[in-house]
Structure formats: C-alpha cells, structure tokens
Design a protein with these regions (language model features):
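Hydrophobic h-region of N-terminal signal peptides that target proteins for export
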Residues: 2-12
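Low-complexity, acidic/polar, glycine-enriched regions of mature
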Residues: 11-195
Length: 195
C-alpha cells in the first residue's frame, strides 16, 4: 500500500494529512506489448488488480513535503484476458509465490505548487524506489492528483524494463514474445483519516 512518510516536522509545522488508499476503488495495471510470432500480430496485454494498499501524506501548506508510500500491490492477484498468460507470469516471470508484492516508496515530489487549493488538479512527478522480485530500482511516476473533500484522487504512470528487475521478457516457445518495456499505471482513491 502507499504510505507517505513524514519528513522531519517541527512542532510549529502543520501536521501532514494522512490518506488511506481504498482498494475497492483503486486499481494497479501493467501494459506490455507482445507479438504473436506465427501471425506477426501485435497486441498490448493489460493486467490489473484492485489489491493495492497504502497511505499518502499530504502537506497542503507546502505540497512538496507530501510523501507517497509504501504503496504495496499484490502481484499474485493480477489478471489479464488470458488465464494462460496470468499463470505463466506468476510462475515463471514475476514468481509471485516467492515475491508476492511490488512496493513503492517515494523519495521526492517534483513540480508541486507552493500552495494547494481543494479541487485543483495538480500534475507532478513522484520519484522513489520500486521493488519487484527483491530488486529495487529508482523510478519516476508522472501523476495527476486532486483533493476533493475527504478524498484524494490520483492517476500515475511510469515505464520500466523487466530486465532491470532481473528477469527476461516472456517468450513462449516461438509463439509469443513480450517487449522488455512495461508501462505501470495506478488509479488511486484514498480517504483522509480522522486526526
């Protein structure tokens, strides 16, 4: 899940607002191109799950102090339009029995406004560490975030390479071959916790 960790906050600074991600209203996805070799046909495979947990900490007075993470996604629950693909990904590539979770923790928020007004969509970059299969790499998410009353709405995307996380792109017996580049997407709805 996403847990935003507070940065050194002195007594004079306002408290960070804590938003808990709502899995039933949120979704994590991957998109990866795959080529069916015998047919020369290209397809974009999409896998998704609602098993997304985490917290986001928001500083309305100084938005750049806001933090995300850890956000945790249960990889074993990813589903696409092909059960065969899903099983192969779980067993051979993501190995989600051994490594069931992907985890992201932010280190920096870039492009945040100096002040925030409720309802205002904000485009920013969230930099941090993504861990998949026990391998951690620095990634940059491009995000649009909006606070609407007690809820935080966010859409974010980043691109990674499978080989950067220690596994080769899926290739099944000359039938289908996936690209190395994968787009990761998050649609998050989080609710502010009572102080």
């Amino acid at each position: 899940m996403v847990v935003l960790a507070a940065v050194a906050a002195g007594a004079a600074q306002p408290a960070l607002e804590r938003y808990q991600i709502l899995p039933e209203a949120s979704e994590a996805r991957y998109r990866v191109g795959e080529t069916f070799l015998g047919e020369g046909r290209f397809n974009v495979a999409v896998g998704r799950t609602r098993d997304v947990r985490g917290v986001i900490l928001v500083d309305r007075q100084r938005p750049a102090r806001s933090r995300v993470g850890p956000i945790v996604v249960d990889l074993s629950t990813l589903q696409s339009d092909s059960a065969r693909r899903d099983n192969a990904i779980r067993q051979r590539w993501l190995e989600s029995t051994r490594f069931p979770e992907a985890r992201f923790v932010s280190t920096e928020v870039r492009g945040a406004p100096s002040r925030y007004r409720d309802g205002q969509p904000v485009e920013l970059e969230v930099v941090g560490d993504l861990t998949v299969r026990g391998v951690t790499r620095r990634v940059v998410w491009k995000a649009t975030v909006r606070l609407a009353g007690p809820e935080l709405l966010a859409q974010a995307a980043t691109s990674v390479r499978m080989t950067d996380f220690g596994f080769q792109p899926p290739s099944i017996l000359g039938f289908v071959r996936a690209e190395d580049d994968v787009t990761l997407e998050l649609d998050l709805v989080a609710r502010r916790e009572s102080p």
